[in-house]
Swiss-Prot record:
Domain of life: Eukaryota
Gene: chl1
Disulfide bonds: none
Name used for this protein in its record: ATP-dependent DNA helicase chl1
Catalytic activity: Couples ATP hydrolysis with the unwinding of duplex DNA at the replication fork by translocating in the 5'-3' direction. This creates two antiparallel DNA single strands (ssDNA). The leading ssDNA polymer is the template for DNA polymerase III holoenzyme which synthesizes a continuous strand; ATP + H2O = ADP + phosphate + H(+)
Amino acid sequence: MELQRNDFHHPYSPYDIQLQLMRALYSCLEQGKVAVFESPTGTGKSLSLICGSLTWLRDHKRSAFQTAVDNATCDDDEPEWMLDFARRESSRMMTEKRKELEERLEKTRKEEEQQRIALENPEGPRKKQKYSIPLTESGGLSEDQFALDDYDSENEEHSKPRDELAHTSELSPSTLELLERFKGQISTAKPGSDDADNDEVKIFYCSRTHSQLTQFAGELRRVKMPWSIPKDLLSTDLTGEEELEERVKHVTLGSRKNLCINPRVSSLENATAINERCLDLQQPNVNPQHRCPFLPSKEDERQVLQFRDHALSTVKDIEDLGKLGKKIGICPYYASRSVVKDSEVCCLRARSSIDLVPDEWQIVTLPYPLLLQRSAREALNSSVKGHVIIIDEAHNLMDAISNIHSVTVTLSQLQTSLSQLTIYGRKFKTRLKGKNRSYVAQVIRLLSSIAAHLRSLLESGKAPEGPVLISELMSGKGVDQINPYKLSRYLQESKLARKVDGYVEFTRDPSDKQASRSPTVPVLFHIQGFLLSLMNPSAEGRLFYSKEQGDIQLKYMLLDPTNQFRELVEDARAIILAGGTMSPMTDYMNHLFSYVPASRLDTFSYGHVIPPENLIAHTLVRGVQGSEFDFTYDARDSEKMIMDLGRTIATLCHVIPDGVVAFFPSYDYLGRVLNIWKKPMLGEQGQTVYNLIGQKKPILSESRDMTVTTEELLHTYANTVDSGRGALLLSVVGGKLSEGINFSDKLGRGVLIVGLPFPNIRSAVWQAKIQYIEQKTHQQATGSEASRQLAAKAAGRDFYENSCMRAVNQCIGRAIRHRNDYAAIVLVDRRYEKPGIQAKLPAWIKQSMVGSSVQRPAGATVQSLAKFFASKST
């Protein structure tokens, strides 16, 4: 039966496409689907995802609650009055427990409301008036802190729990950094630690950026959801809003950098330094007087409970939790963990982490690395089995999976690590015994072998980039006897990376520390990640070298994200991928979900909330001087065509009001275009195309090495547009302005896409990717050898085109941000006329595409655009 509008508890009157999305989402969650949702930015997608998923979750919980009550009976053979009593008693106990929490949170909320009128003391009461001192000062850490503990590889399974060791030894460097932030444990007794009777279904909400998770928290504040207890089982003394609403319990978890309130730690120069200092202050051999005074301990249970109730009473963002921690005098980073058990919604900022997922959570939001990497989920004890996963802004999901499981190491990093290990080895030579001495020697031999091969590549006349074989890296003396898996276990267990980095930092001249402290994790973490890549199936990934500015880097690239994501798909109840521009969707179906039965797969692409007359899209094949726009690799440097492009853009800027954003395929190509535009035109008395465009609209340009920040460039652009002259902003596909930046209203009346931003097909990485797709398709195809080869070539070509068109669609999505917005989209290249290319555009763009013809002159397009904007000015 189709759900009605009010069933989703949307805070506003939803548009029809929002209703369609929420209905489809509800159905997919109920049926356990794997689905891809495309809903343009500006259509209220995030709020629709929240309302649709929370409505389903509350319905599901009510059903589960009723089932639990019905199952609480003694025996079906008992008298009916006894069965009824058992059901009522079970209902009363479960309801009272939940109501008690609601009443406590309501009391706290009212207290906060009363305090809001008072000026808060920014310092707040301190729990203990003392601060940790720098580790290098007298009374801090000694050299003994950095010595390795004895290690016995024959008894490795007893030195650390096997499951924890297996999980953490397989993490990528970026995820190891996340996990290191959570190694310290809170010693406080867990308040309200009653175990749930069963593992309630949760929603894992995953997004990429700080701003997206901040937006999620903001949208959540608007939502009011009904009780998760069946209405006929609720206590009769609930009235008014209390009867209708059960608050959504939410907590935002952040990194130490976001939440640390110890000024001696939070003032350090980067996140890595903050994390390391915090962990160092918790080591057992640190003098208690020098430990962090805000770290929760057993005697701080009252403050932890107070923090929990305040955090849950209203939806708070990361800044609110920081202020709350200062006011109570307790570390909000660790205290926020106590909130998780009773929360329904748990937000994590990008580069944040969780250390467990209690049964009572209903919604868990987290950054990509901790969801997409199996070893991270296991190390955090966070199973997704039977739960729902919603990944928002998922247009780059396949790339994200590949990047998370890819590792890069440079020759300079290898040389630095060798130097640090040598210094460390000399200092602790007499204390390195047995297996420690053996493994440290193995690390040095392996790093030396890899460094020697990279050095030979750097000094050779070989191409700037190319593939590398594992055997080439392991060619050093004695390296073939090394067991990479045992060595990687040793690196993680012994904490050699932290010991070496800590000692080097400890002995560095204090005057050099601020300038020389690296903003990244210790290089041995990168080495560890690289060692793990050597154990991956060779068919799924490749090794590449790349020479850059006197250095050379070695990269393991995961080519196929399918198997890395498969466990999530098979374990989860439902998987939802959502984004503003998910087209083209064939990659998800053919590659990421190729093993999923068709009956479980679904795709949805919704239109925009704007009326059809508010968007016009054109392909532009020829310029105002008749040049055919062909920006293929072999033709794109034609000066005649580039000059005509400039004249055409000048003409378009004359008819498109306010702000126009033009996207080019790359920084290098934009630079070449600008150089040609600034040349004097023949017979024009020194006039340049650049000046010609500037007469219509002032020009601003993005560059790889901008002297201003992106925010400053956007601020200048907005001010120029507001001045009344409008502006032309030259940008790059995949650059700083192509994703996450909104060009709404006057800032984006026109969006021009110049050329198609195909990746460099000649690069070693892309040749390997396409070769892998072709080989995989050939193996899976049926029929004759000729037909299998054709299918393989078609699959490789489709994969290559999809990568390009996803980038194009992201740029197009920068315009049109709300219902009353309007804009023109112009696709400048003859290849946009191809049906296969147009088929990869989002549905909401295709339906606004003006019928095109290769023979149409540019003047006809200009007239069409002039008519479109004239209709908006009346």
